């Protein structure tokens, strides 16, 4: 099917257009009538939630100002078809960053991005804005304090997502100027806000299971969290700068930009504010990252073995432990100077809006059955911890070569107890209580 575009219409494409930040970008573009918008995503058809159906997006689809096209970025033919008639492409599609599957990440973030670039050139797209990530400069060991864009890619990245996003970003920057195509890359730091399907829901799930009491590391690490409306505003600023021509365009094109709220905050303070705003307790129990790392490796190994058989993507992974315990703040001066970017929503206002948008997840709305199961889960796990730690200390106190095997086993048991407490992995039924675990 050939996309029908009239000469007077200005079209843009948003890849991954049904993702968290992408939905907000689509709505902003429609609300301010900047472009007609074509949403490109994997699903065969767009399914609107009730809010979207009755809101500006639903109206725009019915009026023809927004189109939906099913496109897999790994299929160049589909990408070319989806980009026909477009003046601008916002390339926001990427797999979930928590999935440490190199083949998947590479196929989308590198091969898919190559197809996006080639399709842009083939159909005559003028401007390409790529949603990158600050993780492209993270090696998994060294934190970043007020880092700017002069920080190079590390020899080795924290995970497959970061490594392949860096490769994709490099391809976008290298493509600047090819056949008149102008490009730049946006690196938004730790996006949050209404519509988030990962951070807040995961936080609440952990809180309801009694697992949000833990601080990984010493709790002093700073982060740059960025409200989603500021992220989409940065994308619009980038597009406008590339479209300006002259010196503004020359300075903006072919560059990468860190985007933040410009208000660094302690990571665990931010999480605590979200939890308290939703009626849950602040995390208070500190666990050294060095203790969590071997457990995280066990979790990741288990997922690699059991993932094909239905095991859910784990929350606790080695890359996640590193991210939770290090500093990650960035300097957005370059975006301010070259793109004209500055946050439009302050951090505390963003936190308030986020809490308000998740009112249905507040503690007082927790189902009674879920509360009961949580209490039972805590009892079961506490008993396991007490028994296993007692065994550990008894066996560790034993000296002599004859106790080496027992000591090793006891250490494994201790690690297992902590693993169960963090992840809620218990036998389906405990004989003492006879109740099912929480999924």
UniProtKB/Swiss-Prot annotation:
Predominant localisation class: endoplasmic reticulum
Effect after changing residue 328 to I: Lost activity
Known outcome of mutating residue 161 to F: Lost activity
Keywords, comma-separated and alphabetical: Endoplasmic reticulum, Glycoprotein, Lipid biosynthesis, Lipid metabolism, Membrane, NAD, Oxidoreductase, Steroid biosynthesis, Steroid metabolism, Sterol biosynthesis, Sterol metabolism, Transmembrane, Transmembrane helix
Domain named Reticulon: residues: 371-439
InterPro entries: 3Beta_OHSteriod_DH/Estase (IPR002225), Lipid_A_modif_metabolic_enz (IPR050177), NAD(P)-bd_dom_sf (IPR036291)
Glycosylation sites: 75, 158, 327
GO cellular component: endoplasmic reticulum membrane; membrane
Residues annotated as the enzyme's active site: 165
Chain positions of site Essential for the 3betaHSD/D activity: 41, 72, 131, 161, 165, 328
GO molecular function, one term: 3-beta-hydroxysteroid dehydrogenase (NAD+)/C4-decarboxylase activity
Function text: 3beta-hydroxysteroid-dehydrogenase/decarboxylase involved in sterol synthesis. Catalyzes the formation of 3-oxosteroids from 3beta-hydroxysteroids-4alpha-carboxylate. Involved in the regulation of inflorescence internodes and leaves growth, probably by affecting auxin transporter activity possibly by altering sterol composition in the membranes.
Name of the protein in question: 3beta-hydroxysteroid-dehydrogenase/decarboxylase isoform 1
Organism whose genome encodes this protein: Arabidopsis thaliana (Mouse-ear cress)
């Amino acid at each position: 099917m050939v996309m029908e575009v009239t000469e007077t219409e200005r079209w843009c494409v948003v890849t991954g257009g049904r993702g968290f930040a992408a939905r907000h970008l689509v709505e902003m573009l429609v609300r301010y009538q900047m472009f007609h918008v074509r949403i490109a995503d994997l699903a065969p058809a767009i399914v609107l939630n009730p809010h979207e159906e009755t809101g500006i997006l639903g109206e725009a689809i019915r009026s023809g100002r927004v189109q939906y096209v099913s496109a897999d970025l790994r299929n160049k033919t589909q990408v070319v078809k989806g980009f026909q008639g477009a003046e601008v492409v916002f390339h926001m599609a990427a797999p979930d960053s928590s999935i440490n599957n190199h083949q998947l990440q590479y196929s989308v973030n590198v091969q898919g991005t190559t197809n996006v670039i080639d399709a842009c050139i083939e159909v005559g797209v003028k401007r390409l804005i790529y949603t990158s990530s600050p993780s492209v400069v993270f090696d998994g060991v060294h934190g970043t304090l007020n880092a700017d864009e002069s920080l190079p890619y590390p020899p080795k990245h924290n995970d497959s997502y970061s490594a392949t996003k860096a490769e994709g970003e490099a391809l976008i920057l290298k493509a600047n100027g090819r056949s008149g195509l102008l490009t730049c890359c946006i690196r938004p730091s730790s996006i949050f806000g209404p519509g988030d399907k990962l951070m807040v829901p995961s936080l609440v799930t952990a809180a309801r299971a009694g697992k949000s009491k833990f601080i990984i590391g010493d709790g002093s690490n700073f982060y740059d969290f960025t409200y989603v409306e500021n992220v989409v505003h940065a994308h619009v600023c980038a597009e406008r700068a590339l479209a300006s021509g002259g010196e503004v365009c020359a300075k903006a094109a072919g560059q990468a930009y860190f985007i933040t709220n410009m208000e660094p905050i302690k990571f665990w303070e931010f999480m605590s504010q979200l939890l308290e705003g939703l009626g849950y307790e602040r995390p208070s129990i500190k666990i050294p990252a060095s203790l969590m790392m071997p457990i995280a490796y066990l979790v990741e190994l288990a997922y690699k073995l059991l993932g094909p058989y239905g095991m859910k993507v784990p929350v606790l992974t080695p890359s996640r432990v590193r991210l939770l315990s290090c500093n990650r703040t960035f300097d957005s001066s370059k975006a301010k100077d070259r793109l004209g970017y500055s946050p439009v929503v302050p951090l505390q206002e963003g936190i308030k809006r986020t809490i308000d948008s998740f009112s249905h997840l507040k503690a007082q709305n927790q189902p009674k059955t879920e509360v009961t199961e949580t209490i039972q889960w805590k009892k079961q796990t506490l008993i396991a911890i007490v028994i296993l730690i007692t065994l550990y200390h008894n066996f560790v106190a034993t000296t002599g070569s004859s106790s080496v095997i027992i000591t090793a086993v006891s250490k494994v048991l201790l690690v297992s107890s902590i693993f169960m407490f963090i992840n809620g992995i218990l036998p389906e039924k405990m004989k003492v209580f006879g109740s099912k675990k929480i999924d």
